[in-house]
Amino acid sequence: MLKQRTIKSIVKTVGIGLHSGRKVELTLRPAAPGTGIVFSRVDLPTPVDIPASAMSIGDTRLASVLQKDGARVSTVEHLMSACAGLGIDNLYVDVTAEEIPIMDGSAASFVFLIQSAGIEEQNAPKRFIKVTKPVEIRDGDKFARLDPFFGFKLKFTIDFRHPAVDKTGQELEVDFANTSYVREIARARTFGFAHEVEMMRELGLARGGSMDNAIVLDEYRILNNDGLRYDDEFVKHKMLDAIGDLYVVGHPLLASYTAYKSGHGLNNALLRELLAHEDAYEIVTFDDPQSAPKGFAFDTQTAFA
């Protein structure tokens, strides 16, 4: 059977929160089959466990924020994206603040951390959410949509009227049957505009933001000396975010995702719409890994590249 996965050993790292600018300690721990991804605020007098789920996402203005019993864990999307990309089903994520550290602004640090811990298959079938009917959410000209598809592919279109973004492409389509998440998506960094960063800082946000963890643009160009990691890094980062946003549903999706100018809020609304229609999806497992869609049965020791 195609099995669930967790990590082999405990791994730790330290970083800063993008918005708070505060130091955050992050610990990843193995979890039993069927646990899911569970975030734990270990800094609180009584630690609060917040399982990743579509219904636990609260604030989505600047990041995906999980909330429960007054506790929050913000900016979960890059770590969730890494878990999706490496097929991690079960994991405990201990944090000492209300924000996951931003690291280098991409998912690469989390991929490296998970691969350093080692990936372990578990004796339980991996459960997928197979989309059986189209589901769509619209907000003005923005939209996000899931269609039935035997695998996982995404098509994302952004619309940033900026010369540097225009030059690198505003649209990307990826089918993970023949694309490596680690090589092609994981290293794409978050980006922002210098004037917005200044405004956010005045509001007490983006205190941890810098060119070490984001691509920063002025009105005309990229300000980072080292340029881009991918020719189309902007749209690739939006896709990285979407993969993480969608993975909070609790299982990998078997679906085709199409989006135009979507963000954390629309992605979460799409998941809620899907879950509201019981005839739009089913939970499936694969007794024979060979019968599963290509791309899900990759080697657990994929080299970081």
Swiss-Prot record:
The UniProt record lists the EC number as: 3.5.1.108
For whether the record's keyword set contains Chaperone, the answer is: no
Superkingdom classification of source: Bacteria
Pathway assignment: Glycolipid biosynthesis; lipid IV(A) biosynthesis; lipid IV(A) from (3R)-3-hydroxytetradecanoyl-[acyl-carrier-protein] and UDP-N-acetyl-alpha-D-glucosamine: step 2/6
Molecular functions (GO terms): metal ion binding; UDP-3-O-acyl-N-acetylglucosamine deacetylase activity
What are the GO BP annotations of this UniProt entry?
Answer: lipid A biosynthetic process
Q: Write out the GO cellular component annotations.
A: membrane
Q: What class of enzyme is it?
A: hydrolase
Signal peptide positions are none
Pfam family of the protein (one): LpxC
Residue positions binding Zn(2+): H78, H237, D241
What UniProt keywords apply to this chain's record, in alphabetical order? Hydrolase, Lipid A biosynthesis, Lipid biosynthesis, Lipid metabolism, Metal-binding, Zinc
The UniProt record lists the keyword Lipoprotein: no
Q: List the cofactors.
A: Zn(2+)
Which InterPro entries does this one have?
Ribosomal_Su5_D2-typ_SF, UDP-acyl_GlcNac_deAcase, UDP-acyl_GlcNac_deAcase_C, UDP-acyl_N-AcGlcN_deAcase_N
Q: Where is the active site?
A: H264
The reaction(s) catalysed by this protein are: a UDP-3-O-[(3R)-3-hydroxyacyl]-N-acetyl-alpha-D-glucosamine + H2O = a UDP-3-O-[(3R)-3-hydroxyacyl]-alpha-D-glucosamine + acetate
Q: What does this protein do?
A: Catalyzes the hydrolysis of UDP-3-O-myristoyl-N-acetylglucosamine to form UDP-3-O-myristoylglucosamine and acetate, the committed step in lipid A biosynthesis.
PANTHER family per UniProt: UDP-3-O-ACYL-N-ACETYLGLUCOSAMINE DEACETYLASE 1, MITOCHONDRIAL-RELATED (PTHR33694:SF1)
In the record, the note on similarity to other proteins reads: Belongs to the LpxC family.
Q: What is this protein called?
A: UDP-3-O-acyl-N-acetylglucosamine deacetylase
